[in-house]
Amino acid sequence: MGLLDAPPQFARSTTGPDGPVHYVALGEGPPLVLVAAWGPQPGTTAWLTYAGVLERLGAGRRCIAVDLPNFGRTGPLTFHEPAHDPAARAVAAAMDAEGIAAAPVVGTSMGATTGIVLALAAPERVTGLVVGACHASTGGDPYLLAPFPSESGVAAADLAAAPDDEGALRRFLRTLFHDPARVTDELVADTTAFRKQHPEHLRAGAASVSVAHSNMALLSEITVPMLVIHGRSDRMVPFEQGLMISSYVPQADLVALNRCGHWPPVERPVEFADQVELFLRRNGI
């Protein structure tokens, strides 16, 4: 099974407007939708992103965790549009398959921007947002202090140029964590195996063109409760982006997690789940 794949009893799939959509479903109760993070493409699944929090969050909720196109098992999909648009359509397709009309959406990294895009495109489907480790826009937003491209962005480009280089994969994964010990031999081996099993996702991702699109001016249109959870040591999306998003959305609260990189639900799962549960309970959603 490995670190990237959920136990078979939790694995689900459906067909969306762009093709196959894979997701994880577990728990009973009010729905909660989670969207996977950005990372190695392919090789970053919803299970890898949220395995550390799903058992707890699923104790009182029906949790749906969706793979992003070409990163997990969703796809393969070749596109020429803002990358978060087909991702949002995949999330909506998973919600439709589960009979979920509306729900709070939790996303980190690319999954968070996908949640923002879904909330802007179909506000009736999103009752609350937990985001972070993200830009508001496809293609990124301006940085005031941090260098661009980011360390993780450079490492991702190096891996894309040499997709079979295990050393490049290991270096990329290390940039996603505060603690380099998180990049175990098991994680590298499982990610490598997943990438070899899904060459069509690798080809589709390489052939796709993500068109930049700014959501900055639209953020004030989001009126549902919002929480931003950002790792203080994020080397992909600097912490200042969490400050920026929370400043554009008046009702958004911001939580900084120290000793945490780009994947808060992976590196700080207890604290991440604490914040999500408190947010949902406080807002009655």
Residue ranges and their predicted role:
Residues G52-E55, I64-V106, D274:
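Active-site loop/oxyanion-hole signature of alpha/beta-hydrolase fold enzymes
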Residues Q251-I285:
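Catalytic active-site module of serine/aspartate enzymes centered on a nucleophile-bearing elbow/loop
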Residues A162-S220:
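Conserved alpha/beta-hydrolase catalytic His-Asp/Glu region
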Residues G19-R73:
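Conserved HGGG/HGGXW glycine-rich cap/lid loop of the alpha/beta-hydrolase fold
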Residues G107, G111, G115:
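Gly/Ala-rich beta-loop-alpha elbow adjacent to hydrolase catalytic centers
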Residues R235-Q241:
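Conserved alpha/beta-hydrolase "acid-adjacent" motif
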Residues I222, V228-H230, D234:
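Short beta-strand/loop motif that positions the catalytic acidic residue
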Residues I116, L120, T127-A161:
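Flexible "cap/lid" loop of the alpha/beta hydrolase fold
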